[in-house]
Amino acid sequence: MNLVLLGPPGGGKGTQAKRLQDKYGLVQLSTGDMLRAAVASGSEVGKKAKAVMDAGQLVSDEIVIAIIDERLDQADVAKGAIFDGFPRTVAQAEALDAMMAKKGKKLDFAIEIRVPDAYIVERITGRYTCAKCGAGYHDKFQLPQVAGKCDSCGGTEFARRPDDNVDTVTKRLDAYHAQTAPLLPYYDKKGSLKLVDGTMDIADVTKALEGILDASK
């Protein structure tokens, strides 16, 4: 089984991909991880990617597809893959479909974890961590049991990521919508698009995703 997880930054894709990976034996494929692995392996396509990255340029869709092609031939992906962060455009989706068709494979689902922008802004801008041990907290959803004191290590200093501000998050969301909006009708026409409410609790989102995957068996 192969699926694409779509959803905004901060929408919980990574968490859910890990849960599905653990339950179904699927392999989460993130383009960043695959690029780094290809470069480290010294393969032909990895060398091409390294040359482009060293020149400070964006890696082309053609190279990314070649890296995915190579990755799908590896034994650990036999049960299927979860594509996280790719495709981002219709052109990439078409290239991915064509490449998989050559292998006799297909994408079974494109699942959008849908979360309203206001939720994402609240989730991301409220995040902070213990400066000492890295334990995560949130202004609204996960406060320390004792105000100003880390539950894990007792530290009293906390930090926020500079990018976790309203302006930056809004720009990232705008870019996501501009890129991804055309993918939804593309996959809908193919009959593979499914929607899951990402505002539910993490466990409930997982149940909804499992329901989609289990129904296809």
UniProtKB/Swiss-Prot annotation:
A GO term for molecular function: zinc ion binding
Enzyme Commission designation: 2.7.4.3
Chain intervals for the UniProt region annotation (NMP): 30-59
Binding site for AMP: T31, R36, Q57, L58, V59, G85, F86, P87, R88, Q92, R161, R172
GO terms for biological process, alphabetical: AMP salvage
Catalytic activity annotation: AMP + ATP = 2 ADP
Top EC class of this enzyme: transferase
A cellular component annotation (GO) from this entry: cytoplasm
Residue ranges that the Swiss-Prot or TrEMBL entry lists as coiled coil: none
Keyword Kinase carried by entry: yes
Chain spans, region LID: 126-164
Subunit structure: Monomer.
Record function comment: Catalyzes the reversible transfer of the terminal phosphate group between ATP and AMP. Plays an important role in cellular energy homeostasis and in adenine nucleotide metabolism.
Family membership noted in the UniProt record: Belongs to the adenylate kinase family.
Stated name of the protein: Adenylate kinase
Protein species of origin: Paramagnetospirillum magneticum (strain ATCC 700264 / AMB-1) (Magnetospirillum magneticum)
Source organism phylogeny: Bacteria, Pseudomonadati, Pseudomonadota, Alphaproteobacteria, Rhodospirillales
